[in-house]
């Protein structure tokens, strides 16, 4: 990233209403507890509608029937989405059995949705079941604290079961970072777990009384895998190992993908390298990055409030120097690291500890019993007999981790009988979508419901051009908020309107380049016609080992995005 003339450290002006709401919320309590008892509406009123996000929930409604209900003079069919806090995606089989039961008995859709932030979501929780879901999670050692809104969200960690020792160390750091950056308010425990109100004043030494200016995302990544897509995140700790043992981290700050259609003040941005730090400084540095963003982030405009915009406004070196000052360290030069891929290794992998790990491809992360493919029942049966744990990946897949040789056949039999090991193409394995319709209030176009048939069509094109054994990192996101991480794909579709998408090209396989818009507001047939021609050219003209995204740049089909703050919209 180029350094532009540094701007003000703090943006002066009228604060957004979100800042008022946080300040007046009494450390995130609001009147949520009272609202729970209001049976006249299925939703939360006033500030509580937004405050519940700090407690891991979003209020949604079924958009498929919204117009019909409006005609009948009924309020929207409100239900909550709840997202669990699950650093590194590791969940025990006991916990899995509990969430399976809750999903089946207490949600409208009956499904467990794995997300690309290595956790699970319940969709369709009615208001009467909101308190019970928090209590169920607590009973098995889980919570939903700080998985949404202006806090440090669920901390990701590379799913690398092969190098078990390194993964174990990195995972422990992901947990420590998550715990260190949690809010200290007792609101969550008081409202959901019926813990007594204590006559002490709440304090938030790290997050402050008005919390962060905007959402904040953190990862721990183990090269050469970039499965967690570090450049989509505000703060990234890249594991540096010596002789298979973790010794420190490279720190990269200021990634983020969310944009707004037509708003050139918004842009996706890759993270900037700050330097290397030994392990013992990890928590101090994490806190320093968060508090610098807390104090310098833009609280007058939520569309320009994320860390990426703060870095561009004040300058990377200024931000880095402030982090060093607050943490009491000097960063060492970045240690060498490289990425070779982002996908999960589907199927069995033997770890260096001689245990086996089975990665199951879960299309769109949606776990449900489908006709002839009882995925949810199959995973429940595995959870009942498996002595290791489950791991949710950032590609929305699931790893049955730590399977001894003696248990392998038994687990494989259940997985095969449940449709969990059905053969899929390399292209399908490397494609992903966010949830979008019918539950997401921000959705502009279909994503999860669109992807399976769209990939059928892409598979046909790959076969037509003789490249069925290859893949293109392809992602669909229903709106420019970017949950599907399309702005780090080789081919990214960003929803514009029902049935219409912006087509972005020119990202790369390893997720280190932002793609540029190639065509705007086009339909699926138009997308397929463009990709038919381009895949054909790639098949014929590519160099050895050249990915589709790199080819589109080299062939002059699309100009690479070099400095997105300045050239993304050119």
Curated annotation (Swiss-Prot):
GO CC terms, sorted: sulfite reductase complex (NADPH)
SUPFAM superfamilies in the record: Nitrite and sulphite reductase 4Fe-4S domain-like (SSF56014), Nitrite/Sulfite reductase N-terminal domain-like (SSF55124)
Pfam families, per the entry: NIR_SIR, NIR_SIR_ferr
Cofactor binding annotation: Binds 1 siroheme per subunit.
Sequence positions that bind siroheme: 483
Cofactor(s) required, per the database record: siroheme; [4Fe-4S] cluster
Enzyme Commission (EC) number: 1.8.1.2
GO function terms (MF aspect): 4 iron, 4 sulfur cluster binding; heme binding; metal ion binding; NADP binding; sulfite reductase (ferredoxin) activity; sulfite reductase (NADPH) activity
Pathway(s) of this molecule: Sulfur metabolism; hydrogen sulfide biosynthesis; hydrogen sulfide from sulfite (NADPH route): step 1/1
Cytoplasm as UniProt keyword: no
Protein family: Belongs to the nitrite and sulfite reductase 4Fe-4S domain family.
Official protein name in the record: Sulfite reductase [NADPH] hemoprotein beta-component
Organismal lineage: Bacteria, Pseudomonadati, Pseudomonadota, Gammaproteobacteria, Enterobacterales
Gene name linked to the record: cysI
């Amino acid at each position: 990233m180029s350094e532009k003339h540094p701007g003000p450290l703090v943006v002066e002006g009228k604060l957004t209403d979100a800042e008022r709401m946080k300040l007046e919320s009494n450390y995130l309590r609001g009147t949520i507890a009272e609202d729970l008892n209001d049976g006249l509406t299925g939703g939360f009123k006033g500030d509580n509608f937004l405050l519940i996000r700090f407690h891991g929930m979003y209020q949604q409604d079924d958009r498929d029937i919204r117009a019909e209900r409006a005609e009948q003079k009924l309020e929207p069919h409100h239900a909550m989405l709840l997202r669990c806090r699950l650093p590194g995606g590791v969940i025990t089989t006991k916990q899995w059995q509990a969430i399976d039961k809750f999903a089946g008995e207490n949600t409208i859709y009956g499904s467990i949705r794995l997300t690309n932030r290595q956790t699970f979501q319940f969709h369709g929780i009615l208001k009467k079941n909101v308190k019970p879901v928090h209590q169920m999670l607590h009973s098995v050692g889980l919570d939903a604290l700080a998985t949404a809104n202006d806090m440090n969200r669920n901390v990701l960690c590379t799913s690398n079961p092969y190098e078990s020792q390194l993964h174990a160390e990195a995972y422990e750091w992901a947990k420590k970072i998550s715990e260190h950056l949690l809010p200290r308010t007792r609101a969550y425990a008081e409202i959901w777990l019926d813990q007594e109100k204590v006559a002490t004043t709440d304090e938030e030494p790290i997050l402050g009384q008005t919390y962060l200016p905007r959402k904040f995302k953190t990862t721990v990544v183990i090269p050469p895998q970039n499965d967690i897509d570090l450049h989509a995140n505000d703060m990234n700790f890249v594991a540096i190992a010596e002789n298979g043992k973790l010794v420190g981290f490279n720190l990269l700050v200021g990634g983020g993908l969310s944009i707004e259609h037509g708003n050139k003040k918004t842009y996706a941005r890759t993270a900037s390298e700050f330097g290397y730090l030994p392990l013992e400084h990890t928590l101090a540095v994490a806190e320093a990055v968060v508090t610098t963003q807390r104090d310098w982030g833009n609280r007058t405009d939520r569309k320009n409030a994320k860390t990426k915009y703060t870095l561009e406004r004040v300058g990377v070196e200024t931000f880095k120097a402030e982090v060093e000052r607050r943490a009491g360290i000097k960063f060492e030069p970045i240690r060498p690291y490289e990425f070779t891929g982002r996908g999960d290794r589907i199927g069995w992998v033997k770890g260096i500890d001689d245990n086996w790990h089975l990665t199951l491809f879960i299309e769109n992360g949606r776990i449900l019993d489908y006709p002839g493919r009882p995925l949810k029942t199959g995973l429940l049966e595995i959870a009942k007999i498996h002595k290791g744990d489950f791991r949710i990946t950032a590609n929305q897949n699931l790893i049955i981790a730590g399977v001894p040789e003696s248990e392998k056949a038994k687990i494989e039999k259940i997985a095969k009988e449940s449709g969990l090991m059905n053969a899929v193409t390399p292209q399908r394995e490397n494609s992903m979508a966010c949830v979008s319709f019918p539950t997401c209030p921000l959705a502009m176009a279909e994503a999860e419901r669109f992807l399976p048939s769209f990939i059928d069509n892409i598979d046909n094109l790959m076969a037509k051009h003789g490249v069925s054994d290859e893949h293109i990192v392809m992602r669909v996101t229903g709106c420019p908020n970017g949950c599907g991480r399309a702005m780090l794909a080789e081919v990214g579709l960003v929803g514009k309107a029902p049935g219409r998408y912006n087509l972005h090209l020119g990202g790369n396989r390893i997720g280190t380049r932002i793609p540029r818009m190639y065509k705007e507001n086009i339909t699926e047939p138009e997308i397929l016609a463009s990709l038919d021609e381009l895949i054909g050219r790639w098949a014929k003209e590519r160099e050895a080992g050249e990915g589709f995204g790199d080819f589109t740049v080299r062939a002059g089909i699309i100009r690479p995005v070099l400095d997105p703050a300045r050239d993304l919209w050119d």
